[in-house]
Amino acid sequence: IHRPLWQPAFVSIGELMERLSGLRGSDRVKLITELYKVYSRVHDESFDTFYFWGDMLLADFDQIDKYLIDADMLFSNIGDLKALEGDHSYLTDDQIRVIRQFWQSFGSGSSCSDEQRHFLTIWESLADIYHRFRESLSAQGLAYEGMVYRAAAERLLDDEAVALPGDADGRYVVVGFNALSACE
C-alpha cells in the first residue's frame, strides 16, 4: 500500500445486536443477582447455594434465546410422555429415547426420591422464572447476551424498521463466523 487508506466502520456481533435490539448486556454477577431475586420469590434457597445453579440457569436461558426456542414448550411438564407424541420432528429418535428414559426414572410422584421431587418442583417453575427474569431485566434496561440477540432477531423478523450501523450505501461484510445461532 503506497497511499493512506481509511478503515471502514466495524462492529462486533455483540455490538450490532445491542444496537438492533435497543438493549444492553450486563455483567454476569449482576445478572445472577437479578435472577436470584426472581428465583427466591418461588424457592427458598440461600444465595450461596443458588449461585452455582444460577450460573447454569443463566447459561441455559442464554441458549434458549439465542436459538429462538419456545421456553414455555421447553419447560412444560414433559413428565407426561404423551407430550413426546406430538410433532417433535426436530428431535432424533435417540434424543426422544433419552428424554423418555430420563422422565421414566422419576416414576410416579410417590416413588420419587427427595432430590427428584425437588428437581420436579424447580422444573415446573422454570418457565415462570424465565419470563419474570426477562421482564425484570427489561424494566431495568438490562439483558443477558441471548436476550439481546433474541430481541434483535425478533425486531428483524417482525419487519420492524431498524437502522443498521455502517456504510451509507448499505454494503456490509460479515467476517469471522464459525457456527451461527438462529438469531445470528
Task: Kindly give the residue locations of the regions a language model identified.
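Basic/charged alpha-beta structural segments of nucleotide/phosphate-handling enzymes
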Residues: 2-166, 182
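Conserved P-loop NTPase "ATPase switch" module shared by AAA+ and STAND
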Residues: 168-180
